[in-house]
Swiss-Prot record:
Cross-referenced CDD domains: Sec23-like (cd01478), Sec23_C (cd11287)
Protein name: Protein transport protein sec23
Function comment: Component of the coat protein complex II (COPII) which promotes the formation of transport vesicles from the endoplasmic reticulum (ER). The coat has two main functions, the physical deformation of the endoplasmic reticulum membrane into vesicles and the selection of cargo molecules.
Positions bound to Zn(2+): C63, C67, C86, C89
């Protein structure tokens, strides 16, 4: 099968099952697997939308303990004997009584060959409706606070009618608003400079009395404990909550000109976590933190109140010149673990031109499946539109967000799972599917994600099991299998289970060509990028770049065709040719190069990379570039190269985080002269409008909303484009063929051509 046909096949599998594998044939021995260089891995999007597949309204049929695999199309079913054989453990299981009518021609949906992904609505109702706690920073100017209040009031109408809502505001002090008290505005105040233990928070809010262990609790009803004073159903309390929000004032504490406002983000957060963990353990909830500056007092503060003391930079972190960093990270990580253990999500939204301490707070979202959003202000359309998108709904008017989610992976005996890289924490569950090595969050076959949405994607890594001695070859084609079980609380109030079962052939004897042909370079690049970013969190930057280079050289040595020590003979098969340039752009990307980005921005970019699927992640690693000119109708994809900058062309760059329209020198002059508004120049007007329309389409369904930049050749904003291009024409090389028609880039970075020359030289020398 040729590469294009294989790509279409992988794309169909991704549409149906939300999964892409780095290798679509599994090696049959551990030795063979070690020579692959790129690990066997899957980028899996559990809740990928499947509008055409049915929601099964009954409990799944599972194999006996300890296996617990769910009945799937790969199971052998004997309809006469009413038994099925589990493909994971080969145990025989009786079919339940309500399957008595099945025949070869009438089978239940979960056995249909195309039902490799199926979703069940479980009978178990959620213990409480979804909970939303808004944690709002009041140390901000009036315009920003008003815009934020408007966004929050608007969001109340987007919540499910039974959702519980709470409000905590903070500045110099943290205040928990007692929304259930209608006589007047009433709140409990916590001192911003003091650290409160979980027990103290519960006692001060009067929640401890609600912890009577034998209190009868009706399912799907909130526990009618003391927390009901602070968390009210939105339908019943929309008026009160709106009133409280409208009356919110800027923090009254005076701020001197040379000082930052005193802001106790850590106290507000610990109160929110304490409030939910007392009464709503393992019930779906979201703590949404809106901050307009760094925490400057109390636990978790990231900078002092003196303005002359700058917030830490990457340079400070490298030199270990970080006064507050370690203590703050320890505090927020502890909060994140508490929230994750209870199934609660934490989102952090920043509306501030300066850093807010996102680097220290990042694990609040990374451990709990929350969102991180960095914007310049809450008045910006980037914040307003991104915030609304969080509350997107499906055709049945249910929120497209799952709560309290967990993922379990089962494998057949040939495979073992080595870990997961994505927004989750380990559930420390051991099984026969757990591998010996560790990649990412390992030593477990189950993870808790808490928050999950239709775009949430996870990198799951596998190894080939160590078979002792020569295994007896079974008759028929051999295959390895994996099953992904995603449990989550649906916003309709029920638990759902999404099951995806994957089977792939095992390779034949050593040197089987099907192994190399099964390599999906796009999925592999994304899985390797996740490992590189995971390493970058703990290792030095240069070490990570060396690891990326070493892996690329080894992969090329193993799979390219060449004569030893002859770089000119180097050839890669079609399904490997793009991989080196993905790695070239990954090395230069903001995920691994921190120069020109603040630590907060680096944390944000890495967070988003670990959330998206293969397609969107590739746009982040290697942005797309389209060119528009009067000679061609519509857009033409062009190389991400400085040679693509031409005076009479318009370029549209999509980096996922930025969408940029760049006018070449001549086009910019024509536009400034106003030719597009004159008669006879309608084609120029159309040309100027076209990239804007295409940009609008790109922005339409993206989260977070990208920054939109329009610039001209030579303008200061053009740096966003120049920094992404392969510098094939620099001040040292001049243009192609001596004529300088394209842009010259002033940089010492190597070009893709130089990079490839070095790669070929090293790969054919066999010294790696």
């Amino acid at each position: 099968m040729d590469y294009e046909a294989l790509k279409d096949q992988w794309s169909d599998v991704e549409d149906r099952d939300g999964i892409r594998l780095s290798w679509n044939t599994f090696p049959s021995s551990r030795m063979e697997a070690s020579r692959l260089v790129v690990p066997i891995g899957a980028v899996y999007t559990p809740l990928k939308e499947k509008p055409d597949s049915p929601l099964l309204q009954y409990e799944p049929v599972t194999c006996k303990a300890p296996c617990r695999a769910v009945l799937n199309p790969y199971a052998n079913v004997d309809v006469r004997a009413r038994i099925w054989i589990c493909p994971f453990c080969l145990m025989r299981n009786p079919l339940p009584p309500h399957y008595k009518d099945i025949t070869e021609s009438t089978i239940p949906p979960e056995l249909h060959p195309m039902s490799t992904t199926i979703e069940y609505q479980l009978a178990r109702p959620a213990p409480a409706p979804p909970i939303f706690v808004y944690v709002v920073d009041t140390c901000q100017d009036d315009d920003s606070l008003k815009a934020l209040k408007d966004s929050l009031i608007m969001s109340l109408s987007l919540l499910p009618v039974n959702a519980l809502v709470g409000l905590i505001t903070y500045g110099t002090m943290a205040q928990v608003h007692e929304l259930g008290y209608t006589e007047c505005a009433k709140s409990y105040v916590f001192r911003g400079s003091k650290e409160y233990a979980a027990k103290q928070v519960q006692e001060m809010l009067g929640l401890a009395s609600g912890l009577r262990p034998n209190m009868p609790q009706q399912p799907a009803r909130p526990p009618l404990g003391p927390a009901a004073r602070f968390l009210l159903p939105v339908q019943q309390a929309e008026f009160q909550i709106t009133n409280v929000l409208e009356q919110l004032q800027r923090d009254p504490w005076p701020v001197a000109n040379d000082k930052r406002p005193l802001r106790c983000t850590g106290v507000a957060l610990s109160v929110a976590v304490g409030l939910l963990e007392t009464s709503f353990q393992n019930a779906g909830g979201r703590i949404m933190v809106f901050t307009s500056g760094p925490a400057t007092e109390g636990p978790g503060h990231v900078v002092g109140p003196e303005l002359k003391e700058p917030i830490r930079s990457h340079h400070d972190i490298d030199r270990d010149n970080i006064k507050y960093y370690k203590k703050a990270v320890k505090f927020y990580d502890n909060m994140a673990k508490r929230a994750a253990n209870n199934g609660h999500i934490v989102d952090v939204f920043a509306g501030c031109l300066d850093q807010v301490g996102m680097l220290e707070m990042k694990n609040l979202a990374n451990y709990t499946g929350g969102h991180i959003l960095l914007t310049d202000s809450f008045t910006s359309s980037q914040f307003k539109q991104s915030f609304v998108r969080i509350f997107d709904k499906d055709a049945k008017d249910n929120l497209l967000m799952g709560f309290n989610a967990s993922l379990e992976v089962l494998t057949t005996k040939e495979l073992k799972v080595t870990g997961l890289i994505g927004h989750a924490v380990s559930l420390n569950k051991k099984s026969s599917s757990v591998g010996e090595t560790e990649c990412g969050i390992g030593n477990t076959c189950a993870w808790k994600m808490c928050g999950i949405d239709p775009a949430s994607s996870y990198g799951v890594y596998f190894e080939i099991a160590n078979q002792g001695g020569p295994a007896a070859v079974q008759p028929g084609p051999q295959r390895g299998m994996m099953q992904f079980l995603t449990y989550y609380q649906h916003s309709s109030g029920h638990y759902h289970l999404r099951v995806t079962t994957v089977a792939r052939p095992l390779s034949g004897p050593a040197g089987d060509p099907t192994l190399a042909q099964s390599f999906d370079q796009e999925a592999a690049a994304v899985l390797m990028a996740r490992i590189a970013v995971f390493k970058a969190e703990v290792d030095d930057g240069p070490d990570v770049l060396r690891w990326v280079d070493r892996m690329l050289i080894r992969l090329c040595s193993r799979f390219a065709d060449y004569r030893k020590d002859d770089p000119t003979s180097f050839r890669l098969e079609k399904n490997f040719t793009l991989y080196p340039q993905f790695m070239f752009h990954l090395r230069r990307s903001q995920f691994l190069q921190v120069f020109n980005n603040s630590p907060d921005e680096t944390a944000f970019y890495r967070h988003v990379l670990n959330h998206e699927d293969v397609g969107d992640s590739l746009v982040m690693i290697q942005p797309t570039l389209d060119s528009y000119s009067l000679e061609h109708e519509g857009s033409q994809p062009v190389l991400l190269d400085s040679a693509s900058i031409q005076p009479a062309h318009i370029l549209l760059l999509d980096t996922f985080f930025h969408i940029l329209i760049f006018h070449g020198e001549t086009i910019a002059e024509w536009r400034k002269a106003g030719y597009q508004d004159q008669e006879g120049y309608e084609n120029l007007k159309v040309l100027l409008e076209q990239p804007k329309e295409d940009a609008r389409e790109l922005i339409s369904d993206r989260f977070p909303l990208p920054r939109f930049i329009v610039c001209d050749a030579g303008g200061s904003q053009a740096r966003f484009l120049l920094s992404k291009l392969n510098p094939s024409t620099t001040h040292t090389t001049g243009g192609y063929g001596g004529g300088v028609t394209s842009q010259i880039i002033f940089t010492d970075d190597v070009s893709l051509q130089t990079f490839m020359d070095h790669l070929m030289k090293l790969a054919v020398s066999g010294t790696s």
